Regions:
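A contiguous, surface-oriented mixed alpha/beta subdomain in the mid-to-C-terminal portion of proteins
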Residues: 1-61, 65-74, 85-87, 102-324
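A glycine-rich, hydrophobic loop/mini-helix early in the fold
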Residues: 77-91
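Short, cationic low-complexity segments
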Residues: 90-99
Length: 324
């Protein structure tokens, strides 16, 4: 989004709060990922409404669907509640499990309007600040809660409002907890509709590049094992520190492998400056930056003993003044 006013991290996360595992009411909508359901017969019986972009074709792979709870009977809602709870239990063991139920949404519109809005946000065209196309168009699965959770702290409020459109409340799982994004419509009337190019919603290339690191950020957060009681704001702050470290690993230290980026980001998040500025490592950072050597991150990590890591261990609540 071009021309919007930048906000701080604390401002971007203020609309999100922890939520209990949702108990399904008789109204509202579920956003589901049909491809994540092992058995589709029960899901098909609910007649989910596919969010299909214009001229998409017949292959629905990767697309979300809407379930209107007002059209579900008590037995169907019970089945959906069982799915939600089973997925939650699975996430307690494996935090990055692909979810079938992506969100519960309140929206003052009918299912067709909501599905149409989400469909219009799925096709993205990254553009340079000059307005020129930077990359080919792509399908953006922003509705996946593993992605959406990070967008809540990455995106400016106007961009997030554009994404969720008519939704006034968006409840989603992330890692081992559930969260809700409230008050999304507060500024909706002030947000201009996104510019579209040939059926694609345009997105700034810098934002798009950041979203491409979300999977690596999530892997690092899962490895850190953040306490479930840690407030959303602290989890988002940790995610932002991880993003900064992943970017540094990729751009400054020239590590292109995900394992290197995750290892580096994990150690920065755990140990901060004690790891980054350790006398046995500082020369290696310079050599990696200038491409004089090509050590992997795991090789550099092994240069320090377990006792040393224990000595400068920090709580996993890092604060980084450079975080946007």
């Amino acid at each position: 989004m071009i021309g919007q006013t930048a906000t701080t991290l604390s401002q971007r996360v203020e609309r999100v709060s922890v939520s209990p595992v949702p108990l399904l009411p008789e109204t509202g909508y579920l956003i589901v990922d049909p491809g994540a359901f092992a058995e589709s017969d029960e899901l098909d019986s609910l007649r989910p409404l596919m969010c299909r972009p214009t001229n998409w074709g017949r292959d629905f792979t990767g697309l979300p669907a809407i379930i209107d709870l007002a059209h579900c009977d008590a037995g169907q809602r019970d089945w959906l509640a069982i799915v939600i709870n089973a997925e939650h239990e699975s996430r307690l063991r494996m935090q990055l499990t692909r979810p079938g139920v992506c969100a519960y949404v309140d929206a003052p519109v009918d299912a067709n309007t909501l599905a149409g809005h989400l469909a219009n946000q799925l096709l993205i065209l990254p553009v340079e600040k000059s307005g020129h196309r930077a990359l080919p168009g792509a399908l953006w699965r922003f509705f996946d809660p593993r992605v959406f959770a990070n967008l809540c702290w990455m995106l400016e409020p106007e961009h997030l409002t554009t994404l969720v459109g008519p939704a006034s409340r968006w409840v989603f799982p992330w890692l081992d907890s559930w969260y809700e994004c409230n008050g999304i419509l507060d500024t909706a009337s002030d947000v201009a509709p996104p510019e579209r190019i040939g059926g694609f919603a345009r997105i700034d290339i810098d934002i798009w590049d950041r979203t491409q690191r979300i999977a690596t950020i999530n892997q690092t957060l899962a490895r850190l094992g953040l306490p479930s009681e840690l407030p959303w704001q602290d989890k988002a702050a940790t995610a932002a520190v991880v993003e900064s470290a992943v970017t540094e690993a990729e751009r400054r230290l020239h590590w292109k492998q995900t394992d290197d980026q995750v290892n580096y980001a994990e150690h920065i998040a755990r140990y901060g400056a004690a790891f980054r500025n350790h006398p046995r490592l500082v020369d290696h950072w310079v050599k990696l930056e200038t491409r004089v050597e090509t050590f992997s991150c795991s090789e550099l990590i092994a240069l320090l003993s377990q006792e040393e890591y224990e000595e400068f261990a920090q709580p996993t609540r890092p604060r980084d003044p450079t975080v946007r």
